[in-house]
Amino acid sequence: ANRNEKLDFLGEGQFATVYKARDKNTNQIVAIKKIKLGHRSEAKDGINRTALREIKLLQELSHPNIIGLLDAFGHKSNISLVFDFMETDLEVIIKDNSLVLTPSHIKAYMLMTLQGLEYLHQHWILHRDLKPNNLLLDENGVLKLADFGLAKSFGSPNWAYTHQVVTRWYRAPELLFGARMYGVGVDMWAVGCILAELLLRVPFLPGDSDLDQLTRIFETLGTPTEEQWPDMCSLPDYVTFKSFPGIPLQHIFIAAGDDLLELIQGLFLFNPCTRITASQALRTKYFSNRPGPTPGCQLPRPNCPVEALKEQSNPAMATKRKRAEALEQ
């Protein structure tokens, strides 16, 4: 642990605090995710299960669009994960109104997201918590999927998963209806929400409760029929909704060409069994048509420091940082 010199506080989540540090041996800049102690019931062998899951998964994965786990160390019931340091994330890029996002930029972000996701799904892993601030970008503009705390291997058949995954705005309708068995479709729906957010520069379906989330989905995309989604009525928390016609996608995404609209439509299919997969998405016309994706080194970089942007939109963050720094003294 002493080989790392702390440089900066980067953020705090429900389960962890993240610091920027320098590896004294290699001079490499890294990010250290310090996992908070779980409650007694959670502390398994002294280590929080979420961390164990993340370590096991990440050690097995190697792909340019997936965050690299460099090291893991711990003592007693405390564990730290050492990752590649990433300059920023997609949420920061989307929120920075001084940046222009061109169709080529958006295509590059989608391409890298789907390549990372295809690799995960080919290894029988669902991410289950995709959102813009889990898509990290390094200084070369390479996007990497991160925060595998909720990731789960879906190879075991009939595994009853929990449906309380994925930040609500990115949550697929089957999860909102309480599905305990689900597959790659939950990640693909989240990708659709992220793509929409890249195009609109604001969250696409920002619901403030599960019911409100479903209402927003159906008002925007139309209420699905039994034909469109045969298993819908048998889901544990299914409730009937008013029949909304939905808004045509070309009226929502006015700048999008037909190839892009086709991809969006595939990502937002209600039936998870027919929803487009990552491999299928990568083979769509959208990715073979011009314009091509922007090379990483030419992608926009945030104009003001990441921390300032986040604190601006979330004053509690500044307070948390000051508190964490005080505790570190």
Swiss-Prot record:
It comes from the Eukaryota. Associates primarily with cyclin-H (CCNH) and MAT1 to form the CAK complex. CAK can further associate with the core-TFIIH to form the TFIIH basal transcription factor; this complex is sensitive to UV light. The CAK complex binds to p53/TP53 in response to DNA damage. Interacts with CDK2, SF1/NR5A1, PUF60 and PRKCI. Interacts with HINT1. InterPro entries: CDK, CDK7, Kinase-like_dom_sf, Prot_kinase_dom, Protein_kinase_ATP_BS, Ser/Thr_kinase_AS. Phosphorylation of Ser-156 during mitosis inactivates the enzyme. Phosphorylation of Thr-162 is required for activity. Phosphorylated at Ser-156 and Thr-162 by CDK2. It comes from Rattus norvegicus (Rat). The keyword Iron does not apply. The modification Phosphoserine is found at residues 156, 313. This is Cyclin-dependent kinase 7. It is found in: Nucleus; Cytoplasm; Cytoplasm, Perinuclear region. GO terms for molecular function: ATP binding; ATP-dependent activity, acting on DNA; cyclin-dependent protein serine/threonine kinase activity; kinase activity; protein kinase activity; protein serine kinase activity; protein-containing complex binding; RNA polymerase II CTD heptapeptide repeat kinase activity. It holds the Pfam family Pkinase. ATP binds at residues 10-18, 33. Keywords: ATP-binding, Cell cycle, Cell division, Cytoplasm, DNA damage, DNA repair, Kinase, Meiosis, Nucleotide-binding, Nucleus, Phosphoprotein, Serine/threonine-protein kinase, Transcription, Transcription regulation, Transferase. Residues 309-329 are annotated as: Disordered. Serine/threonine kinase involved in cell cycle control and in RNA polymerase II-mediated RNA transcription. Cyclin-dependent kinases (CDKs) are activated by the binding to a cyclin and mediate the progression through the cell cycle. Each different complex controls a specific transition between 2 subsequent phases in the cell cycle. Required for both activation and complex formation of CDK1/cyclin-B during G2-M transition, and for activation of CDK2/cyclins during G1-S transition (but not complex formation). CDK7 is the catalytic subunit of the CDK-activating kinase (CAK) complex.
